[in-house]
């Protein structure tokens, strides 16, 4: 889908497909575009200092509502860690809370805990508080959920999650978002900025493959920004999902158009095949 992003100064055109790669050396421009997209679909009110981010986004000349996408953006290692922790408003806490409230077996377990606490408090009131005048102990069942909020995430060896590799953090955050949005019906856009500064080339290939597979079977789409040579994955199926951001923004055309152009304009002594075309 082609997005036309218009602010007071300029109009931009980007293609959003399955697993998008934004390459090129203009990191500032890429960050600005992604921040504009994230702010727009956040539905948050623009503040005075958001002037550069304020925009309107269209597709096929129709204005997209600000709730069209649910956007998740990761900018750093610290953000990857923070969302896997259980804390107020973290993705992990939302996921676990939703599961606790929706799983029958979990609710049965919570009721059993409530029954046991009721017996404990009954004993305390009968044996310890019987001599007090009009005073009893009790508990609020809603406070049981505080136990979950106070839980701690560890790796399978019992170590703090700060021992997880960046690759594991990125993969787990992707899987967490998949679980969170599985039945939401939302169109989901997951953004990883400067992922080439976090992963090796081989690790990035695995994450890109995971993103591609998920975009084929779920409501999730991805944007990865890259600036280091050799990271961008190019094949005849993903050409249109590559955006080059240097002085200008260039969305690559479909593979067959590139092939036809090269055949018409390159010297005839070059042996043209798919492998040569992709590598060059």
Q: Residue spans of the language-model regions?
A:
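Glycine-rich P-loop/Walker A and Walker A-like loops and their local beta1-loop-alpha1 context
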Residues: 1-69, 86-107, 111, 278-280
């Amino acid at each position: 889908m082609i997005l036309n992003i218009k602010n007071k100064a300029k109009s931009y055109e980007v293609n959003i497909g399955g697993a998008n790669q934004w390459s090129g050396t203009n990191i500032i421009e890429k960050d600005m575009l992604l921040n504009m997209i994230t702010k727009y679909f956040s539905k948050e009110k623009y503040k005075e200092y958001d002037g550069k981010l304020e925009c309107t986004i269209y597709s096929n000349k129709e204005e997209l509502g600000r709730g069209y996408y649910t956007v998740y953006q990761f900018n750093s290692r610290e953000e990857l860690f923070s969302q896997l922790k259980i804390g107020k408003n973290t993705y992990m806490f939302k996921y676990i809370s939703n599961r606790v409230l929706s799983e029958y077996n979990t609710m049965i377990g919570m009721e059993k805990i409530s029954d046991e606490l009721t017996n404990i408090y009954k004993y305390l009131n009968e044996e310890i508080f019987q001599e007090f005048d009009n005073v009893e102990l009790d508990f609020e069942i809603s406070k049981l959920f505080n136990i979950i909020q106070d839980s701690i995430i560890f790796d399978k060896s019992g170590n703090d999650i700060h021992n997880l590799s960046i690759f594991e953090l990125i993969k787990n955050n992707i899987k967490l978002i998949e679980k969170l949005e599985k039945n939401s019906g939302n169109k989901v856009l997951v953004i990883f900025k400067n992922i080439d500064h976090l992963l090796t080339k081989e690790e990035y290939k695995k994450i890109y493959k995971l993103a591609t597979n998920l975009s084929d079977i779920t409501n999730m789409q991805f944007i990865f920004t890259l600036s280091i040579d050799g990271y961008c994955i190019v094949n005849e199926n993903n050409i249109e999902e590559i955006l080059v951001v240097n002085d200008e923004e260039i969305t690559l055309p479909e593979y067959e158009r590139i092939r036809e152009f090269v055949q018409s304009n390159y010297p005839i002594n070059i042996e043209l095949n798919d492998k040569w075309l992709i590598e060059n």
